[in-house]
Design a protein with these regions (language model features):
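Glycine-rich, flexible beta-strand/loop modules in the N-terminal catalytic cores of phosphate-handling
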Residues: 1-65, 71-78, 137, 144
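Short intrinsically disordered coil segments
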Residues: 30-32, 83, 121-122
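Mobile "lid/hinge" segments at catalytic clefts and subdomain interfaces of large enzymes
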Residues: 96-158
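Amphipathic alpha-helical transducer elements in NTP-driven molecular machines
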Residues: 46, 81-85, 152-156
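Glycine-rich anion/phosphate-binding loop at the beta-strand->alpha-helix junction
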Residues: 49, 63-99, 104-106
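Gly/Lys-enriched N-terminal cap/neck module of very large, oligomeric protein machines
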Residues: 1, 10-12, 66, 101-105, ...
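N-terminal start-of-chain detector that recognizes signal peptides
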Residues: 38-43, 77-81, 103-106, 113-116
Length: 158
């Protein structure tokens, strides 16, 4: 966290997700051995993290804050976005940064008439519903959903 920036009318929050190749047991083979640019999924995960945490900072807070979530290990079967969001919330909560958290997030899928909590990539491909909810003890902070044609009652139940 830096000192407050003068002359800006927004909260300068930067969220980065670093997906390291060593997390899945690979070492880049190029001459420079660099990790490269973030993937589209990493960019979408950064946005997923930013949306629910941004409103939990105090109004008028102008200090620049950078949040970097680094993948240390991955089984390549479980999406990392929910884990990263919960990790960021935990880190901000225990830091000295003024943050009105914590918040918790989960993803729900719906396969064969049953809800699946934090489904794998394979289960998400079969799922009729993909809904992510992030909330604090006071209420929902962010909800993101994607679905095929599905009954409204199922969405409400999720």
């Amino acid at each position: 966290m830096s000192t407050p920036r003068q002359g800006i009318d927004f909260f300068p929050l930067t969220v980065d997700l670093e997906e390291r190749h060593y997390a899945i047991g690979q070492i880049p083979g190029s001459f420079f051995r660099r990790e490269g640019r973030p993937t589209t999924q990493a960019i979408l995960t950064c946005r997923l993290i930013d949306r629910p945490i941004r409103p939990l900072f105090p109004k008028g807070f102008k200090n620049e804050v950078q949040v970097i979530a680094t993948t240390l290990s991955s089984d390549k079967e479980t999406p990392l976005d929910i884990l990263a969001l919960n990790g960021v919330s935990t880190a901000l909560t225990i830091s000295n940064i003024p943050f009105n958290g914590p918040l918790a997030a989960t993803r729900m899928g719906y396969i064969d008439g049953e809800f699946i909590v934090n489904p794998s990539y394979e289960q998400l491909n079969e799922s009729l519903l993909d809904i992510v909810v992030a909330s604090t003890k006071d209420g929902v902070s962010m909800m993101e959903a994607g679905a095929t044609e599905i009954d409204e009652d199922i969405v409400y139940e999720a």
